[in-house]
């Protein structure tokens, strides 16, 4: 199995904490200090992962001269993913479970921010289309600030078929689109497990995927810009779900 490099203090710490991937070795730049650095060292010792002090040149040769590694690099195997069936089985009995369907998001920064947002709100899982999606590699981990390490992820081939299986299990599937049928705050999102669907940077949600959803909602705009970055839209969407669920 091909190994990956994880870099940045927060991503490295979260990778060590989550134990979702096997780690081979930790490299710490000489002179690197701070609480997170100490946390990283302690976690590596707890997991019996060998670590070495290296100079700046060594780390730059590993990850690239223009990469902000923040003085720590982790050599690890790719993180373990689940199947969509496993994510569904874990959450189908929860009336307030929330999962995210990501349809063809190609920018690693956007996919990483989606994972960070989902982890922040405690979303139960992310289901990502395999076709035309950013790979779950080091830039995605970095953009997620390590959030991708703590959340269940599945990569799926037949996107619409998986949506139908979640619907059969009682999930209500909601697409977020700029031209949605109604404003998100006018929809009742309480009392049911939800799947929120977001689409790629260029085409949005594919028509065949959109037609499979139970609702298509929009985030209302009052300015001259009529659309949001996909990760920002998802964050607002999840927040509205959580807000509604917290009220009677």
Model-derived segments and their meaning:
Residues 142-147, 207-248:
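Structured adenosyl-cofactor binding patch, chiefly the S-adenosyl-L-methionine
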Residues 1-89:
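N-terminal positively charged helical leader segments and presequences
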Residues 17, 21, 28, 85, ...:
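RNA substrate-binding interface of SAM-dependent RNA methyltransferases
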Residues 31-32, 57, 131-133, 201-203, ...:
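Short, acidic/turn-prone active-site loops that include or flank metal/cofactor-
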Residues 174-229:
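Active-site/ligand-binding-proximal alpha/beta "capping" segment
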Residues 52, 126-129, 218:
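Short hydrophobic alpha-helical runs that function as membrane-insertion/retention elements
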Residues 68-72, 142-147, 190-194:
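Short, hinge-like loop/turn segments at secondary-structure boundaries
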């Amino acid at each position: 199995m091909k190994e990956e490099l994880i870099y940045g203090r927060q991503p490295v710490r979260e990778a060590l904490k989550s134990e979702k991937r096997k780690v081979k070795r930790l490299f710490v730049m000489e002179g690197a200090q701070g609480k997170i650095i100490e946390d990283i060292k302690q976690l590596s010792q707890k997991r019996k992962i060998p670590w070495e002090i290296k100079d700046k040149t060594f780390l730059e040769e590993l990850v690239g001269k223009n990469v902000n590694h923040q003085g720590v690099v982790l050599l690890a195997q790719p993180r373990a993913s689940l199947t969509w069936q496993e994510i569904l089985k874990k959450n189908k009995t929860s009336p307030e479970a929330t999962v995210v369907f990501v349809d063809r998001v190609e920018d690693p920064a956007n996919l990483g921010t989606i994972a960070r947002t989902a982890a922040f709100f405690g979303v139960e899982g992310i289901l990502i289309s395999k076709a035309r999606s950013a790979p779950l590699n080091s830039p995605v981990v970095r953009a997620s600030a390590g959030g991708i390490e703590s959340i269940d992820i599945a990569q799926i081939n037949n996107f619409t078929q998986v949506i139908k299986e979640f619907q059969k299990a009682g999930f209500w599937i909601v697409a977020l689109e700029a031209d949605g049928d109604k404003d998100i705050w006018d929809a009742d999102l309480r009392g049911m497990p939800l799947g929120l669907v977001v689409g790629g940077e260029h085409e949005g949600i594919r028509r065949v995927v959109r037609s499979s959803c139970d609702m298509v909602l929009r985030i209302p705009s009052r300015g001259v810009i009529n659309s949001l970055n996909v990760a920002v839209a998802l964050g607002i969407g999840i927040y509205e779900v959580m807000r509604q669920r917290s009220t009677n």
